[in-house]
Amino acid sequence: MEDPNPEENMKQQDSPKERSPQSPGGNICHLGAPKCTRCLITFADSKFQERHMKREHPADFVAQKLQGVLFICFTCARSFPSSKALITHQRSHGPAAKPTLPVATTTAQPTFPCPDCGKTFGQAVSLRRHRQMHEVRAPPGTFACTECGQDFAQEAGLHQHYIRHARGEL
């Protein structure tokens, strides 16, 4: 028996199910297909899911996109999981608080130095990602200085530390 509208059944739709000419009713649900976490609609691919989330659940869409993003205070460089927490914190600095983090000039390549180790970055987002590394503490002694015993989370930090010992800075 031939389907009267084969083109209609082959179209992918932004709908709960995808049309398939193989199934009698034309509706199948693929295992592992992307679906909406709010209304449990299944989509043909992630582009349809993303479009649905933007249109139907914009607050959830924005929250999902910002998941894992850190918001940095430009006065004291503390990081916060949400913009609301950052704004609340910034009020504690008072109205006269001035940013202590460097502001990039427009005439030269912008540089953003890490206040913890001095390493510089060309973008604020790179500095933010790097600062997360300082917050993650390695088990004590992972990379320890043999001269003074200071611990480092990464081998590169220990290497820079040894250079400072060699220059007599420590």
Swiss-Prot record:
InterPro entries found in the cross-reference section: ZnF_C2H2-type_TF (IPR050888), Znf_C2H2_sf (IPR036236), Znf_C2H2_type (IPR013087)
SMART domains: ZnF_C2H2
Annotated region described as Disordered, given as residue ranges: 1-29
Main location class: nucleus
Pfam families tied to this protein: zf-C2H2, zf-C2H2_6
Localization in the cell: Nucleus
Compositional bias of kind Basic and acidic residues: 8-20
Xref: PROSITE patterns: ZINC_FINGER_C2H2_1 (PS00028), ZINC_FINGER_C2H2_2 (PS50157)
ZnF C2H2-type: positions: 34-57, 71-93, 112-134, 143-165
UniProt KW Zinc-finger keyword: yes
Keyword field contains Transferase: no
Gene Ontology terms for molecular function: DNA binding; DNA-binding transcription factor activity; zinc ion binding
Protein's job: May be involved in transcriptional regulation.
Family membership noted in the UniProt record: Belongs to the krueppel C2H2-type zinc-finger protein family.
Name of the protein described by the UniProt record: Zinc finger protein 576
